[in-house]
Every structure is written in structure tokens, then in C-alpha cells.
Amino acid sequence: MENKFAFAKEIVKEAASYIRKHMKDDLHVERKTSPTDLVTRLDKEVQDFLVDKILSRYPHDQFCAEEGNLRASINQDSVWVIDPIDGTNNFVAQGEDFAIMVAYFENGIGQFGIIYDVMKDACYHGGGAFRAYLNDQPLPDFKNKPLCDFLIAGNAGMLESNTWGVADLSKASLGVRVYGSAAISFSRILSGQLLAYITYLQPWDYAAASILGEGLGYQIVTLSGEPVDFESRQPIMMAPREKLAEIQSYIYERKLS
């Protein structure tokens, strides 16, 4: 597994270099399911690059990835979950605050995750049997303190409408941040800068963080308190295990019928 982990980090860094080299080119921006659901030429090229690299080394591995129709279940033998550019709107509009995310599973068990903040050259990597790091520095275990001393991150629409009581939770916290990228939000949690992140996500949006956070004391669950299914878009949150009950006291009582 160490060789596979090292290989994954290597190809993710190569993909990041490719993005930085070509991000000023014509991106051929398209809209998928809505006016704000953007995809670029580089989303597709980076995913193809990663898949091709992996298959050249591990020809029997399978994939669940954002672009196209790669939808293998993580419960199969060897499955990579890939989001080639998370935060595509940030990528297009700002040229920063976007990331590559890769997770690797064997028979449903997360082996390692990688979140690579492309413009900051910040690689969050580890999980499973590996200690979680930011580049070469160990990531901190969760340190508890009162809810009112923590920032949280969330979905702007959920906050505005108080869906699931997210606005109520934000009022009990130190404040709320909206980053426009699951990867960037998760990286802030892993660094100890945020308590929790609440939004709607697809499996490729949270797979890497679910593996990275486990050993640091964090968990990803649905807003109805169940394990995520790694198959569909769901309302989810990442939060410290020891804070889940307190957060649930704001969230779950107000869930939509």
C-alpha cells in the first residue's frame, strides 16, 4: 500500500502542475445541470490524466469520478474516487481556492485520501494506515473547546433558508464561512481552523476527506445522522465525533419533512 500511496501523491502533483501550466488557456467552460454548475476542459483532461496513469500501473482498478460515467462502487475490490477540480467556479472566476481530490478504497475500506490545494501547493494526505499530513507536517488531532469559539462552514442557500437549522447552528458558533469548495472547507477542518462543514455533496466531493479525517477524530455523516452512502448526492456534515451530539441538537430537530 505504501507504493500505491506514493504513486497517488506523485500523479496528483503532476496533475496540479498541468493545471497551473494550462489554466490561462481557453478553458471551454460549459454548464452541466444548472447555470452555476460549471465544467471546463481541464476538469476533463485532469480526470483523464489521472485515470490513464492509474490504469497504466494498476490495470484492474476501477473508478468513481465526477466527469463522465465512471461510477464503480467503493465496495468493489480496488476503487479510486476522483474529483479532478473541486471548486470549478472558484477556478474559473478567481484562479484559486480549488483542489484535486483522490481517495482509494479496497472492499469498502478507505486506504488513503489526498486533497491538493493547487495554487497553495498544499497537499493534505494520509488516512487509513497512514498518519495525516499537510505536506511534511502532521495534521493536528481535534482539540475541543466551546462551540461559541469555533467557526463553521456551510452552504449559502442552507444558511439563508435555515435548512436543517444550519443558521441556528451558525448563530451559536463564532461565525460562518462559505468557501465555494468542499475540498477547501475540508482542508480548513483538517487544519483545525473550522469545527464543521455542512452542505449537499456527491461521493467524490467527500471521499478523500472521510478517510483523512477519521484518524484525527472527525466523521462524515448525513444530516439525518446516518452513514453516507458513497452513491448519491446527500446533505452531509463533517464534524468531530465528540461534537456530533452537540451539533445534532441544532441540526436534526429541524430537518425537512
Task: List each language-model region with its residue ranges.
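Generic detector of well-ordered alpha-helical packing
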Residues: 44, 67, 84-87, 118, ...
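A structural micro-motif at secondary-structure boundaries
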Residues: 134-138
